């Protein structure tokens, strides 16, 4: 498995709405993530800085990257753009983080 971590932002007035929209996520989005080899996906909120820290284990970079082109992911991004800063294609602004320590 490949471990990934990334950081995103949530609008200051949208913390509760962001969480509501993820509990639960759409069943079809969950299915796409699993079908594309995502496991142990978690998102954490830093309320003071309005940051989202996400971790996920993936089976392959290619399969993970393919999620973005699915119809359900495109709909999800459009749905979420109201609560978080987004790119012109509606994908959330995000930065991948480099792993500097891991304890198995």
UniProtKB/Swiss-Prot annotation:
Keyword flag Kinase: no
> Which residues of this protein are catalytic?
22
Pathway field: Carbohydrate metabolism; L-rhamnose metabolism
Q: Which SUPFAM superfamilies match?
A: Dimeric alpha+beta barrel (SSF54909)
User: Which Gene3D superfamilies does this one have?
Assistant: 3.30.70.100
A GO molecular-function term, please?
A: L-rhamnose mutarotase activity
What top-level class of enzyme does the UniProt entry assign? Answer: isomerase
Q: What is its main location?
A: cytoplasm
Residues noted as binding substrate in the record, renumbered to the chain: 18, 41, 76-77
Q: Which domain of life is it from?
A: Bacteria
Question: What does the protein in this record do?
Answer: Involved in the anomeric conversion of L-rhamnose.
Quaternary structure and interacting proteins, as annotated: Homodimer.
Q: Could you identify this protein by its name?
A: L-rhamnose mutarotase
| Species for this entry | Klebsiella pneumoniae (strain 342)
